[in-house]
Amino acid sequence: MAGTNGGGAFLLVYIFFTIAIGLPVMLAEFSLGRRSQQNALGTFRVLAPGTKWFLFGLLSIIAAALILSFYGTVSGWTLEYVWLSISNSFQGQSAEDSIFTNFISHPYKALLWHIGFMFLTGAIIMGGVQKGIERYSKLMMPLLFIIIIALSINSMTLSGSAEGLRFLFFPKLSELTADSILSALGQAFFSLSVGMGILLTYASYIPKNDNLTGISLKVIITDTLVAILAGIAILPAVFSFHIDPQAGPGLVFLTLPKVFQGLPAGEIWAILFFILLTFAALTSAISLLEVPVAYLVEEKKLKRPWATVIATLVITCIGSFNTLSFGPLRHVQIFGMSLFDACDYLCSNILLPLGGILICIFAGWYLDKSILYSEISNNGSLKTRFFRLAPICIFLILLNVLGII
């Protein structure tokens, strides 16, 4: 995202949104979820009985499912590239070679990886939060952090890496546009998992004596640190090998194999990097799938295995259309966008900011403030004006992008 939206300027706006808007929205979601001890829909059914607020909970569940439908597509690509790295299939290939294009446009190969990734996610989440999610997260996240630090150190030793670091850390505010600002907001929401029901659902598992402010700050600091390390790991290497930083998804799947060929022990670095991507994708997918699964278990009273199977199958089917939009369904367009791009745009630019606005309005204006103060375990030092300010900021950004102001 930083490569396609101005580098350091995008990073600066992203960090600002993460702290100024992401923190209060996250605190609001944590507070509501822990207070209700319910899923995304049940939270509003319990805290706002007899109202239409439950529809926002339903919207959050739909948003999580749609995000996972296209996220599973990209995650399937990472599995393919793990295999290509292990089999050393990149050897002798140039950045212009069409391994990636041939793969995603193949009639069924990308689809099989998408299905495989989704069923792997379902198998993990079937065990529940503690047996499934927590166990694998404790293994994957420290390993992810170690790998990305190693890649960052290696990347900074490359010739010409200073240019990449300059691109990342010296912002050019003139390159910011309304669209890139909205992208930074959407990326902040996506990386923090706010506005899509994940935090509402996970907060129902948080013990009552845990400090929500401390948890939120730890999440934001860790997320921001990982984002910066990822930029250090990728962008200096990209500039070192004279690759266009605005390549977007192609930056990873089209050009980085070429980058790894020029590194000492490049095969090992390639394997580590794409395993890193797979781990990151899997942890996010697990969180997204838990939202509809928790809804089916708590609202529809299904057993967790059946709820997981149903949610996984439905999302996999939707995601299959997104996956095939690069191949057999590439001519199908919605408002001039492919199925994949349309789904991405709907979620990132509309549903997530809208979710952030609604959660802040509910917490800052509708809900009894005593509930927030009793849940936020910092002796009431967080004032509700943060919740009143956040939706206004988000709303103004949306109006600006739409050309209304």
What residues fall within each predicted segment?
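Select transmembrane alpha-helical segments in multipass membrane proteins
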Residues: A9-V13, T51-A65, L112-F117, L176-L185, ...
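Helix-loop-helix connectors at the membrane interface of multi-pass transporters/channels
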Residues: G42, S75-S105, I206-N209, G214, ...
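Loop-to-transmembrane helix boundary motifs in multi-pass membrane proteins
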Residues: A110-L112, T222-I228, E267-A270, F279-L282, ...
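Inter-helical loop and helix-membrane interface segments of multi-pass membrane transporters/permeases
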Residues: A2-N5, A40-L59, G72-Q130, A162-L182, ...
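Juxtamembrane transmembrane-helix boundary signature
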Residues: V13-A48, A237, F241-D244, I361-W365
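Extracellular loop-to-transmembrane helix junctions
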Residues: G3-A28, K109-A110, S348, L352-G355
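C-terminal membrane-solvent junction of multi-pass transporters and transport-like membrane proteins
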Residues: F56-L59, L302-T312, D344-I394
